[in-house]
Amino acid sequence: MAPNHGALLYEGKAKRVYYTDNSDEFLVHFKNDATAFNAKKHAQLEGKGSLNCEISTEIFKLLERNGIATHFLNLEDDCWMLVQRVDVIPIEIVIRNIASGSLCKQTPIAPGTELSRPLMDLYLKDDVLEDPLLTEERIDLLNLLSSSQRKEIQRLSLRVNDCLKEFMKGLDLLLVDFKLEMGFNGSGQLLIADEISPDSCRIWDLKTNDQDDRILDKDRFRKDLGGVLEGYSEILRRIKAFNS
């Protein structure tokens, strides 16, 4: 059952954000929509919203336990999350540990190559422009971040990566890469926002060497492999088994 909420603030490809009676809090509803290639590919997968909401909840709690502040406040229902209000930075932060996806299209690095160190790529959040890659000069030109803010984002992103990589390893999972969004709350604190789920991460199963079977994330949808919900469910199952 949906919790009480106010008017719709924003609807994206995978979530809706609603006002609440507290001006410092929002309610986020995770949708069952599956999209890829900037929503050029679209489907409805019953139960996907609930899986992403629960997985994000567990990961946000993990980060909080490790001293990394997030916008998460409470899981209100199976696909509803109460979060702090933040001013989201219009930048997508992608941390890469293993070469995959666009990195392999833009460089000669072979898919599956372990990178010598985590690579941080920044992208402008703009669907019309299809989220172009940003350079430091472009960030300065667009006045998106100060130098100190860029350094803080990098520091925080790498902390998240260290925490998630170690956690995933304990679940026999490999964190290939993932997307983060961040924002500032009313006190000016930088928080991890949005979601961290198989929609925003590439996660491989270390229990198999099969290049298709090991995929447990949205690449199953992108590549028409089927079993999208089964992959997401397996990630949640391992998280819950670890926490029990």
Swiss-Prot record:
InterPro entries referenced in this protein's UniProt entry, alphabetically: SAICAR_synt/ADE2_N, SAICAR_synt_PurC, SAICAR_synth, SAICAR_synthetase, SAICAR_synthetase_CS
One Gene Ontology term from the biological process aspect of the record: cobalamin biosynthetic process
Pathway given in the UniProt record: Purine metabolism; IMP biosynthesis via de novo pathway; 5-amino-1-(5-phospho-D-ribosyl)imidazole-4-carboxamide from 5-amino-1-(5-phospho-D-ribosyl)imidazole-4-carboxylate: step 1/2
Reactions catalysed according to its record: 5-amino-1-(5-phospho-D-ribosyl)imidazole-4-carboxylate + L-aspartate + ATP = (2S)-2-[5-amino-1-(5-phospho-beta-D-ribosyl)imidazole-4-carboxamido]succinate + ADP + phosphate + 2 H(+)
NCBIfam families: purC
Homology family: Belongs to the SAICAR synthetase family.
Protein name stated in the entry: Phosphoribosylaminoimidazole-succinocarboxamide synthase
Protein species of origin: Prochlorococcus marinus (strain SARG / CCMP1375 / SS120)
Gene: purC
